Swiss-Prot record:
InterPro entries: FLASH, Gon4l/CASP8AP2_myb-like. GO terms for biological process: extrinsic apoptotic signaling pathway via death domain receptors; Fas signaling pathway. Self-associates. Interacts with NPAT. Interacts with SRRT. Interacts (via SIM domains) with SUMO1 and SUMO2. Interacts with SP100; may negatively regulate CASP8AP2 export from the nucleus to the cytoplasm. Interacts with NCOA2 and NCOA3. Component of the death-inducing signaling complex (DISC) with CASP8, FADD and FAS. Interacts with TRAF2. CDD domains: CASP8AP2. Residues 223-234, 428-438, 874-887 have a biased composition (Polar residues). Its main location: cytoplasm. The modification Phosphoserine is found at S20, S560, S798, S858, S923. The modification N6-acetyllysine is found at K1323. GO terms for cellular component: cytoplasm; mitochondrion; nucleus; PML body. This is CASP8-associated protein 2. The gene is Casp8ap2. It comes from Mus musculus (Mouse). It is found in: Cytoplasm; Nucleus; Nucleus, PML body; Mitochondrion.
Length: 1962
């Protein structure tokens, strides 16, 4: 702004008066006042200069601009420095990351070596495991038996964990060589599963080495387990380790590895990734692994597929473990094949069991990888070309899965089974949360989960043992699963292909092929891996889920162990091998993978076969998972691409392929499995889901996982029992938690597929939007499609379980003893698994459907869950996601509501998955919660809605809402999907309802005594306040320092409490439309508290972390709560008024209250207004909930402003309503509705009738929504920096006021929000303000006459809205009795209260106050540019109203100027800016602006020799208006205040004029609405003028001026509506209202003020009024006399002059009227500085009048001292008239014969000036305010010219600049007035005084002073040229007079003319 100000303002200055600014720079003749500073030699000039270093306005302006520019430059420099520092920090971080990557790469290298050794060991282990697998398959042939055996195997594994670990170290070295050997053998013998695995491991040497290195680092790692376990197991362990390590590395270094991966080999990055994981960078590792995977998959799609298959296999293994029951059935079918594969895989798993135990947390996810690796190994054999990479990936991934399995086994054994399940569910949710953090993590999440597992494996070496035990069990389990799950595995693996399951797999795979291929196209390498993973996950759907969850786990994206546990527990229940969480998942997966184990090779072979279809899909899946892993950078990009492309290419299928492929095959397979292996596959799916849940649980606190595990176990048992019942459902549920989401949306055919699609979408979407957001949307999408699908119920249960688990986790169940549970689960769960296949089902089975019910409740409970979760979230990684998400959400929260409504639906429509990511920012937790809710509440709906349209849109929609409501809206959203229109109004209430449900009545009763059926508003408010106290009590429990999240939780709980209270109350006694009232209340509560929760003030408080932060924050919150209560009370009053307000107060009481409020205290009025405002706001919020949710964003405010503009009538009505209320509160209370209906029938306002109220509320909401929004808590940006860019004028005013008054912005935004609600349409408000500003009588008149007119309709409400709430803050500044003299642009704020006080009618005074507030809002919007208000607030007159005569420091003035310039540039119109500038100047003057301070003399005495001061009245980019005023003390601040008021008004009036013109054009319409108020104002003006004439206006002036301002505001408002009509109408109105003037005379004080405002806003009207008054009063001569008298009486000769001028103008044209108005305005100002010659200062606004006043004052306050005054008055009038040439002429003639003579002379220069003035005036009425300014300027110019023609010219130039928008007539008039003999005399006098002010403009050429011109010289030239017309004769005369050469005079005149023209052009 500063820069702009400089450019704009400086340019404006230059353009306006180029010479002056270029004083020394421009040596050309245009340097009019170049020597002004030096030239000022007079002591007077010196004195003036003393106040302003020089009289050169331009210098001041330039100085100010320079200061502003410098400040801006300094700020920018600081910002630049900060940015540079940030760059340095980022570069430092980058270098650190690079170093880390290098280290990781090195570590990966060493890990590769270790892995090769492990591979060797693994071969041995594989052999051993193969044998064991065969044995296990035999045992697995029977489920219960298998489970027991598996559990025993697990126990064995756990027992052999240490031996395995020992072996691990031993075999590690062997493995290295083996790895090398294996690579080729595997490649050569892809059929050999061992070799395949070894080969995959070898090919994944990086992964293997990573795993090995991890294992090495964790000497206890599964390497030993692998070795000890079996050669195969060791080999598997190597692979698993490598896979796990790779996953970990990928997880930890994935992001880093993205870059490294692109530059480095997969192995190297993975080594680095492994190192990173070892270093504890699971996320990075996951990412790098994703990259590595993507690269590997890129290099070899088959390998990628194999890897993916492996991942899927491991995921599937988990699922298989869960699905063991079914899998066993299937495995019986494919037992032989699967036994072989399963043996290999089981050997891997045996290796992995120790790893899994170690990695159990991670391994739940990694197991799929391990299995997948096994699959990949097989696939690698099948696909020798790609085996190396695939094997690498496979081995590494497998290692990860193995490791993860081991860890997960341990975790599950500890009770992680339930945790595993919960983790799995959470994994789908929290994983989505974390994946939200790591957008890639949803798909890659699986891979990452495995990767996380390795990371965890590092942390959990013991899990290796458990994993080993689990693997042993898994081997047996897998044997069984091979027996039972072979078909299932065939679906997912080659063996699956053998069976119909294989067909299903192929079916899914083809789908994957479709989607994944396109995904592969998007990122072939990544897609290859993802495709492999997805394809494998197709074979291993559960595994795919597990892969995601594993991935998440690897990335620490996994949900807390609680979630994992449930999955694991379910796995243990379902699978004998499940007992160890990892082992269970793995065992299951292995069972399924038993079949999968065989299938992996088969699956991978299948993949190879289906590879043509699936390779790319697999790759896509791998790519997706890899992308997710590497998503940090690439994820967002690639995954978005994948998602988008997949969406575009594959559409739903592709999305499934992309994200769902991992899980999609599973859904298809699961569906097929339902048919074939229904129970087994479902269990498999359950296993996968549980694995995912366990992974999710991992994300959550592990203890939570434990509890979740237990819960899940219970549910599992139930689920197992119900497993068969709802196998399909369970499968879907599992898919839903894990892959179902991914497949859900895209594989709509497969219910599970859509579910999977959702998951994938979640993963994909997360990458696109935000990790958490994306993931969460995906989850929601997932839930929606799942809802659509059968999984709906099952999925719902899963989410519910997840929620329950989450709750448990949150509650501290997360203290779960993973290890203990693992051990216990290994034993107990295994046992349970055998007997409880159904209980395992709970995850997938009817128990889950029950969970669905629970989920539905959970959705209700989710709010609590959210709160508790959030409370505990800090401990969860999810929390961080949630935090970041919520931060993002914060920023977008309000927009989100809107977005929810529109964008959300749209985005959902576009890409439920993709756009969810992009369109929504959501914390994972929110997403998961939202998903749960969606699953719960939206499931039916979503199933109908989401599934049909893929429900992605609906899902996204819900996602958005979830995000917005932190997941609470998730439920809401589904509901809203169905009732989207309802969502905006109901979403919050529905949310609230859920919250209320969550917050039971009993819980509320514990907090406060509930009166469920309150009989009075007071009872309701009392309960609300008690709740507020409870909130405070909770808040005060915080320590001095607490986190933002804690605060958010407090606020969220407060929202919940309040909304719950509102929901539980039966308000039927109070209100008829209870639901509407409750909705309104809830919406207001939510919107307000959300704003409290998320706004810049709170953020800054937390950022600053001050010692008193807690106190300050609560102060803010308390204020907001008070504001909220007021708002709620208003809503209640509104709703209760129609019903039983008598319960609280009778209607009469209300009316009394209103009256009291308006009359007795601003506070009361404020309260009432606030109530009304709140009512309106509530209504508004109902209709504009979305907007409100925008948190009054600046854009929203702008939009609201636009809305207000569009709804100008509404706003007007509001204003009028406010006005009416203010004028007649009782009447308004009674007639408000009538007024509303009458004045805004089309725009019903909140009224008495609630039914009516809703519509009215909508209209009012729209109208006041803007204002309300404008005054809502300022956005962070707004609060932090007073940017008016996006800030509405009202808000600017509010901010400015707050800053100046020191009132907290929060107060303003909070309490005053309602007040200022209507202030946004300041200009429109002006109409009602004008009416309001009219004295109470006039107001009543208006009310009575135009009761139906808008003025009264909203006046009280709106005024309260506008000023009452803000009034107090305003009153804080305005409370000081503001003298009209003090009235400043800034003072206007003050004046509003002062004026209100000043007015006899407190009511009108309050009205005035709002009006002034409006004016200030406008002006402040203009002047509130930036730092200056803060800088100068101490000097601001309204801050120091009493210091009227004290001079405002120049810096303050300059600050105002810069503000104005900035403000104008930013968002203020030129008119407003001009006003602001002038106002600033006047405010400076009023507070004794620089030149006012110079003329310290309180009384203006006409001293021709006194120096004149040029005051910049207007400054803008284009131009600046300079008022040349006498420095004499006579220029009292009052003048400037009047000027300021006028200027401020002018700025408003300009719009107002337009409105007025329009009104006149549409006199009937506007007369009824606006015109009458305008007429009243005019009458008031006339009355004021008469009062001034008749009464001594001194007192009146003060009061009157304020009314004038208000009137003016009203007029301005009217004018805003009808700008063009103003002039004519004003004449008519004035004429029409002339008779009314007498009536208005009573209101004269306010009227007089109104004239000022009118002058500015409705100059014509004011002129008309004056004209009327003049006509009524006397002839021109009489008028002049009267004017003189008035000036004396009022100490406002100016006012008299103005009136005189008006009288003259009455005969004159509208321009003349404008000029007259200016005079009147000046008169008000002048009345303040009566007879103060400083009319020059007023010149800009009312300076000319002031000059006259000065003379008059000097002569005496009595008009008779006028003789000179009269001449001056004539001059002034003429000057004003000269503003409009026509009127000028008329005036001249009317005034006197002498004036015409002089007029001719003056008119010549005036004509010159008129050129510019005409240009300014050319705008016509719209510029009438400027014209007034210009006229005033001209007057002061005339006076100045009297002082000195040169000075006059200067002043004229400035005036012309100021009156750019005014017509030249003003100048002519001023000149002609000066032309009068007295004018000549005064000119002579002035000529003397200019000496002081006559800083000679030194015209230099080549450094030589040729001519020096004083301002007096310029004035003289201009005056004479105006009078005599520019001619040689005139120039000669002037040359003699000025001792110059006629040519010089002529040249000077031309220069001045050029200046004026230039300013005109500007």
């Amino acid at each position: 702004m500063a820069a702009d100000d400089d450019n704009g303002d400086g340019t404006g200055l230059f353009d306006v008066c180029p010479a002056s600014p270029l004083k020394n720079n421009d040596e050309g003749s245009l340097d009019i006042y170049a020597g002004l500073d030096s030239a000022v030699s007079d002591s007077t000039a010196r004195s003036c200069v003393s106040f302003r270093n020089c009289l050169d306005l331009y210098e001041e302006i330039l100085t100010e601009e320079g200061t502003a520019k410098e400040a801006t430059y300094n700020d920018l420099q600081i910002e630049y420095g900060k940015c540079q520092q940030q760059m340095k920090d980022l570069m430092k971080r980058f270098k650190e990351i690079q170093t880390q990557n290098l280290n990781l790469k090195n570590e990966n290298q060493s890990l590769k070596k270790n892995i090769s050794a492990l591979i060797k060991t693994a071969r041995v282990e594989i052999n051993r495991k193969d044998e064991e697998i065969n044995h296990l398959h035999q045992r697995l042939s029977e489920f219960p038996h298998f489970r027991n055996n598996h559990k025993t195997a697990r126990t064995k594994d756990s027992q052999s964990t240490s031996p395995h670990l020992d072996d691990c170290s031993k075999t590690d070295h062997g493995v290295k060589s083996d790895v090398q050997k294996d690579v080729h053998p595997n490649t050569a013998q892809p059929n050999l599963e061992k070799e395949g695995k070894s080969h995959s491991e070898a090919q994944n040497p990086l992964h293997l080495s990573t795993g090995v290195e991890k294992h090495c680092a964790n000497n206890v790692w599964s390497r030993s387990p692998y070795q000890v376990g079996e050669g195969n197991s060791n080999e598997d362990n190597r692979r698993g380790r490598s896979g796990t390590r790779h996953s970990q590395c990928s997880r930890g270094t994935d992001r880093t590895q993205k870059d490294l991966h692109s530059s480095c080999n997969d192995s190297e990055p993975r080594d680095k990734e492994a190192n990173s994981r070892l270093q504890g960078h699971p996320e990075k590792h996951g990412n790098s692994e994703a990259r590595t995977e993507s690269k590997i998959s890129e290099s070899k799609s088959s390998t990628g597929m194999g890897y993916k298959s492996e991942r899927s296999a491991s995921s599937w293994e988990k699922e298989t473990s869960r699905e063991r029951p079914h899998t066993r059935v299937e495995s019986q079918h494919d037992k032989n094949l699967e036994k072989q594969n399963e043996r290999l895989q089981n050997m891997h798993r045996k290796e992995l069991p120790s790893q899994d135990k170690t990695e159990r947390k991670v391994d739940v996810k990694f197991k799929p990888a391990g299995e997948e690796q096994g699959h990949r190994g097989r696939v690698d054999r099948a696909l020798p070309p790609h085996p190396k990479n695939d094997v690498k990936h496979y081995g590494f991934n497998k290692y990860h899965p193995e490791e993860r399995r081991g860890r997960e086994d341990c975790k599950r054994d500890r009770g992680m089974n339930s945790h595993g399940f919960q983790d799995r569910r959470c994994s789908s949710f929290l994983s989505s949360n974390r994946n939200s953090k790591y957008p890639h993590s949803k798909e890659v999440s699986v891979a990452h989960q495995w990767e996380n597992t390795p990371f965890k494996a590092e942390r959990h070496r013991t899990e290796d043992r458990r994993k080993r035990e689990r693997e042993n069990k898994e081997e047996s389990r897998h044997v069984k699963s091979d027996k039972k799950s072979p078909p299932e595995h065939l679906q997912r693996t080659h063996k699956d292909t053998k069976k119909s399951t294989a067909d299903g797999k192929r079916q899914t795979e083809p789908k994957h092929g479709k989607g994944a291929v396109s995904n592969s196209e998007l990122s072939k390498g990544t897609d290859s891996k993802e495709g492999a993973t997805k394809v494998e996950s197709g074979p291993n759907e559960a595994k795919g889920k597990d892969l995601k969850l594993s991935f998440m786990e690897k990335l620490n994206l996994t949900l807390s162990p609680a979630k994992k546990q449930p999955a694991c527990q379910d796995n243990p229940h379902q699978i004998t091998g499940v007992p160890e969480p990892s082992g269970t998942c793995d065992s299951r997966s292995l069972e399924t993978t038993g079949t999968v184990a065989c299938l992996p090779s088969g699956s991978e072979h299948n993949r190879e076969e289906t590879k043509s279809e699936l390779p790319e899909p697999k790759e896509a899946l791998l790519a997706t998972s890899q992308l997710r892993i590497s998503i940090p950078e690439n994820k967002m990009k690639e995954e978005k691409r994948l998602l988008f492309k997949s969406v575009e290419n594959t559409v739903p299928c592709e999305l499934l392929a992309c994200g769902t492929e991992i899980s999609l095959p599973a859904p298809v397979e699961i569906e097929q499995a339902r048919c074939l292996l229904g129970s087994v596959e479902v269990e498999e799916t359950c296993g996968g889901a549980r694995t995912a849940a366990s992974v999710v649980m991992h994300v959550l606190p592990e203890h939570a996982s434990e509890d979740a595990s237990q819960e899940l176990d219970t549910k599992r048992h139930d689920g197992i029992n119900a497993c068969a019942i709802s196998e399909g459902v369970k499968t879907k549920v599992i898919l839903s938690p894990k892959a179902a989401a991914a497949s859900e949306s895209h594989l709509a055919p497969l219910v599970e597929e859509p579910s999977i699609s959702l998951v994938n979408c979640s993963g994909d979407n997360n990458p696109k939007l935000e990790p958490s957001l994306e993931e969460r949307p995906i989850v929601e999408t997932k839930s929606c499609p799942l809802e659509s699908c059968l999984p709906k119920e099952t999925f719902v249960p899963s989410p519910q379980k997840t929620e329950l688990i989450d709750h448990k986790i949150e509650t501290g169940e997360s203290n779960s003893v993973y290890q203990d549970d693992d051990n216990s689960v290994l034993s107990i769960d295994f046992n349970n698994l055998r007997p409880i296949p159904d209980p395992i089902s709970p995850l997938n089975s009817p128990v889950r459907p029950v969970c669905k019910v629970v989920s539905m409740e959970s959705s209700c409970a989710i709010p609590l869950y959210d709160s508790s979760h959030k409370d505990e979230f800090p401990s969860n990684s999810t929390l961080s996601t949630f935090k970041s998400q919520s931060d993002l959400n914060k920023e977008n929260e309000k927009p989100v509501p809107k977005f929810d409504k529109c964008s959300e639906a749209d985005s959902c429509k576009h890409l439920s998955l993709d756009e969810l990511e992009e369109g929504e920012i959501r914390s994972d937790d929110e997403e998961s919660v939202a998903q749960k809710r969606l699953e719960k509440s939206a499931r039916p709906r979503v199933s109908a809605e989401v599934q049909p349209g893929k429900s992605s849109p609906g899902s996204r929609r819900s996602t958005v809402h979830v995000h917005k409501d932190n997941g609470r809206t998730a439920v809401k959203l589904p509901r809203d999907r169905l009732t989207w229109s309802k969502r905006s109004s109901e979403s919050r209430p529905s949310n609230t309802e859920r919250k209320s449900k969550t917050m039971s009545i009993s819980s509320l009763e514990k907090i406060l005594p509930l009166i469920l059926v309150p009989s009075s508003l007071w009872e309701v408010m009392h309960m609300l306040r008690l709740l507020g106290k409870h909130v405070r009590k909770n808040y005060m429990k915080f320590k001095i320092k607490f986190s933002l999240t804690q605060f958010h939780r407090i606020i969220e709980s407060a929202i919940l409490s309040f909304t719950s209270l509102v929901k539980c109350l039966d308000l039927s006694k109070i209100c008829k439309s209870v639901s509407t009232l409750q909705k309104s209340l809830c919406e207001v509560i939510e919107s307000n508290l959300k704003q409290v929760k998320k706004n810049g003030i709170v953020d800054r408080l937390f950022e600053q972390q001050q010692t008193d932060m807690k106190k300050k924050l609560w102060k803010f919150v308390d204020e907001q709560l008070d504001y909220l209560f007021e708002k709620l009370k208003k809503i209640l009053l509104k709703f209760c008024d129609s019903v039983n307000f008598e319960n609280e107060n009778s209607e009469g009481k209300l009316g009394k209250k209103y009256k009291e409020r308006t009359q007795h205290s601003n506070c009361q009025k404020k309260k009432m207004d606030n109530k009304e405002i709140r009512r309106e706001k509530v209504l508004k919020s109902e209709n504009t909930v979305n907007f409100k949710s925008s948190l009054g964003c600046e854009k929203s405010e702008e939009k609201h402003q636009d809305q207000n503009k569009t709804n100008a009538s509404i706003v007007k009505h509001d204003v009028k309503r406010t006005f009416s209320t203010c004028s007649d509160n009782t009447k308004n209370a009674e007639c408000k509705e009538q007024f509303l209906e009458k004045s805004c029938p089309s725009t019903p306002r909140p009224g008495k009738d609630e039914g009516h109220t809703e519509e009215e509320a909508q209209a009012a909401q729209h109208a006041s929504a803007k204002s309300e929004r404008s005054f809502e808590i300022l956005t962070e940006q707004q609060a932090s920096s007073l940017t008016f860019n996006l800030v509405s004028d009202a808000q600017m005013g509010e901010i400015f006021k707050s800053l100046l008054q020191g009132s907290d912005l929060l107060d303003t935004s909070g309490t005053e929000k309602a007040e200022w609600e209507l202030k946004t349409p300041e200009k429109q408000l002006l109409e009602s303000l004008k009416c309001e500003s009219a004295p109470a009588c006039a107001t009543e008149e208006l009310v009575s006459e135009g009761a139906s007119l808008c003025p009264k309709v909203i006046s009280d409400d709106n005024w309260s809205l506008l000023s009452s709430e803000k009034g107090p803050s305003l009153s804080s500044g305005l409370s000081l009795p503001v003298h009209p003299d003090v009235l400043d642009e800034n003072c206007m704020f003050e004046v509003s209260s002062n004026t209100a006080l000043g007015k006899d009618n407190v009511y009108s005074s309050e009205k005035s106050k709002p009006c002034i507030s409006s004016i200030l809002l406008e002006d402040l919007a203009v002047s509130l540019t930036v730092p200056s208000p803060l800088k100068s607030d101490g000097h601001l007159s309204f801050l120091k109203p009493e210091v009227l005569s004290t001079s405002t420091p120049e810096e303050v003035i300059s600050a105002h100027f810069s503000e104005d310039a900035l403000l104008e540039e930013e968002d203020a119109s030129e008119q407003d800016i001009h006003l602001a500038l002038e106002s600033d100047n006047s405010s400076s003057k009023s507070s004794c602006s620089s030149w006012t301070s110079r003329s310290v003399a309180s009384g203006f005495q006409y001293h021709p020799n006194l120096p004149m001061h040029a005051v910049i009245m207007e400054k803008s980019n284009d131009h600046f208006i300079v008022k040349i005023r006498r420095a004499t003390p006579s220029t009292s601040p009052g003048l400037k205040h009047g000027v300021v008021a006028e200027e401020s008004l002018t700025s408003l009036p300009r719009t107002g004029k337009e409105a007025g013109v329009a009104t006149e054009k549409e006199p009937n319409l506007f007369q009824s609405t606006v015109l009458k108020p305008v007429k009243d104002l005019e009458n008031t003006d006339k009355n004021i003028d008469k009062s001034k004439l008749t009464h001594e206006e001194q007192n009146s002036i003060v009061q009157t001026q304020v009314p004038d301002i208000y009137e003016f505001l009203k007029d301005a408002s009217n004018k805003v509506v009808h700008c063009d009509q103003v002039v004519d109408d004003c004449f008519k109105l004035h004429q029409v209202w002339e008779p009314k003037v007498s009536e208005n005379l009573q209101e004269l004080p306010s009227m007089e003020k109104i004239p000022h405002s009118l002058d500015n806003h409705l100059p014509d009207t004011h002129i008309d009024l004056t004209k009327d008054s003049a006509t009524e009063t006397k002839s021109l001569g009489e008028l002049m006399e009267v004017t003189v008298l008035n000036v004396d009486h009022l100490e406002c000769s100016q006012t008299n002059l103005d009136q005189d001028a008006e009288i003259t103008c009455s005969s004159l044209q509208p321009d003349t009227i404008d000029a007259f108005i200016d005079l009147t305005h000046d008169a008000s100002s002048e009345s303040k500085n009566e007879g103060s010659e400083p009319v020059l200062a007023v010149e800009g606004m009312g300076c000319q009048v002031i000059c006259i006043d000065e003379d008059t004052n000097k002569e005496g306050k009595m008009g008779r001292a006028n003789s000179p005054l009269e001449s001056i008055v004539e001059e002034t009038c003429i000057d004003l008239t000269s503003e409009s040439p026509g009127s000028c002429e008329i005036k001249r003639h009317n005034l006197k014969s002498e004036p015409p003579s002089k007029l001719d002379c003056l008119e010549l220069p005036e004509t010159l000036g008129n050129g510019h003035k005409k240009r300014k005036n050319s705008p016509g009425v719209s510029h009438s305010s400027q014209k007034k300014q210009r006229k005033d300027i001209d007057l002061s110019s005339e006076k100045t010219q009297r002082l000195s023609p040169n000075s006059d010219r200067n002043g004229d130039a400035h005036r012309k600049q100021a009156s750019k928008k005014r017509e030249p007539a003003v100048n002519e008039t001023s000149l002609s007035s000066e032309a009068s003999p007295e004018v000549k005399g005064s000119t002579a006098v002035l000529a003397a005084s200019p000496a002081s002010l006559s800083a000679k403009n030194v015209i230099k050429k080549k450094g030589e002073i040729i001519v020096s011109w004083t301002r007096n010289d310029d004035r003289e030239i201009l005056l004479e040229c105006q009078k005599r017309m520019p001619s040689l004769k005139t120039f000669t005369y002037l040359a003699v007079k000025l001792n110059k050469n006629p040519n010089q005079v002529s040249e000077r005149f031309q220069q001045l003319k050029k200046l004026f023209e230039k300013s005109k052009c500007r």
